[in-house]
Each structure stands twice: as structure tokens, then as C-alpha cells.
Amino acid sequence: MSEKIAILSAYSFVNIEEPESLIPKLLFVGKRKYVKGTILLSKEGFNGSFSGSYESVNLVLEELKKLTNTKDVNVKINYSEIHPFQKLKVRLKKEIVAMNVDNLNVNLFKGEYIETKDWDEFITKQDVIVVDTRNDYEVEVGTFKAAINPYTETFKQFPAWAEQNAELLKGKKIAMFCTGGIRCEKSTSLLKSMGHEEVYHLKGGILQYLEDTQNKNNLWQGECFVFDDRRAVADDLAPAEGYWLERK
């Protein structure tokens, strides 16, 4: 039986003085180890999702940690029968997840994590508002029961939604979620900076939730959209039927 492909997602909000200098080093290590995927670099940190053998993706992760001088990295690994990415790309960006809000200090303002095992109980409380921070096309594929859909086309539209719905959110316990956790880091930071006090988010995102709980209470409805050739995964994190992007 052939070895399954490991898919590693990792992000960290860490100051990188010259992110462009990391590009050739990461490309060299990644290509030498036959790793495929995308790594985004900016002065605010890094965000990557890449696939290969378990050993190879972890070598790239260790290189990222070394080059950015950080151990504080959010990491998620799952597995696939084949590579969900077609090649390795390392790109320089203004933000590792684009929200277009200047001077937002994610490490200073951050929501409180809710562990996956506690999420179902928390979001069914009467005084909790649940907000899906993802885009509308992702929400259409699947979301949590009773979650608010901001109907955004891009994450850059989320701040405007937050401003327009400030009264709706005022004084409430706000539970937010996204695919792997990174958008929640920024969206909870935004709401905290706006003065909302009780702001929470699902630790590890939907993917970690499905892995840990198998959706045992059926509060997750549908499939989870992902940004690779699988397009969507089911409760068991296997590619959802009918979504796989055929290679040309």
C-alpha cells in the first residue's frame, strides 16, 4: 500500500523584517523534497498549506520556523490519496490573510479560543451569536446550524459587515469560525479592537472540529469548502463526492 500524502496547514502572526528573502530558501527546500502547495509571506507572518510525504512537509515547516525565528505556529495535518496541489508557490503579500485593515495588532487584540470538544455546547447557548467569517460561496457548501452568513464575496468585505452590524453584536457573546482558524484570528481581533468584549473563536477551525468530533451532534450541515483540488471535504475529511477538481 502506498504512503498517503500529508497535507500540512500552518500559520503564525510573527514579525518578519524581510519576508522576500525567505522565498528562494523555501522554494529550494520545498522543491528538493517534492512538496507542493502555497506559502504566503508578509511582514505580519506566514500562512501556508502544502502537501508531500509526512517527513517532507515537516521539514518545510521546520524551515519556516527557523527562518522566522518562531515556535508559536498553528499547525494542522490531514491526509489524501494524491497531491491536492499541482506545484509549489511561495508568494510575497501585504497580508497573510487579506482584510485591508491597517495597524490591526492580532497579537494584542485576540478572541478567546473555544476547544472543539466544547464548541457544540457553547454555540447552542441562548445568549451566543454564531458568525461564519467565510465567504458566501464557502457558506453555501456547508456551515454550522443557525450561523449568521455575512454574505461576503471576499474577506476584505468583512470589516464593513462588522461596522454595519455593530448594534446586532453589541453586548453579545460572539462565536466565530472559519476553515482552519486564521481568518478568525483577524476577525476576532477586529471585533475586539471595535470594543466588543466577549469574542470567541473555534480553535483549529472547521477542519479540526470535524477531525475531533466527527460532527457527532450534526450541528455542522453540509461539507467544508477547501482551497485546493478537493474543493470540499465531508465529515470524515475525505474529499466530498462531486466536488473534486479534475486535472487538465
From Swiss-Prot:
SUPFAM superfamilies reported in the protein's UniProt record: Rhodanese/Cell cycle control phosphatase (SSF52821)
Its EC number(s): 1.14.-.-
UniProt catalytic activity: uridine(34) in tRNA + AH2 + O2 = 5-hydroxyuridine(34) in tRNA + A + H2O
SMART domains: RHOD
UniProt keyword list: Oxidoreductase, tRNA processing
GO molecular function: oxidoreductase activity, acting on paired donors, with incorporation or reduction of molecular oxygen
Catalytic site positions: 178 (cysteine persulfide intermediate)
Main enzyme class: oxidoreductase
Pfam families: Rhodanese (PF00581), UPF0176_N (PF17773)
Domain of life: Bacteria
One BP annotation, GO: tRNA modification
Residue ranges of every copy of the Rhodanese domain listed in the record: 124-218
Annotated signal peptide: none
Gene3D superfamilies documented for this protein: 3.30.70.100, Rhodanese-like domain
Family: Belongs to the TrhO family.
Function description: Catalyzes oxygen-dependent 5-hydroxyuridine (ho5U) modification at position 34 in tRNAs.
HAMAP family (UniProt xref): TrhO
NCBIfam families on file: PRK01415.1
Record's protein name: tRNA uridine(34) hydroxylase
Source species: Rickettsia bellii (strain OSU 85-389)
Lineage: Bacteria, Pseudomonadati, Pseudomonadota, Alphaproteobacteria, Rickettsiales
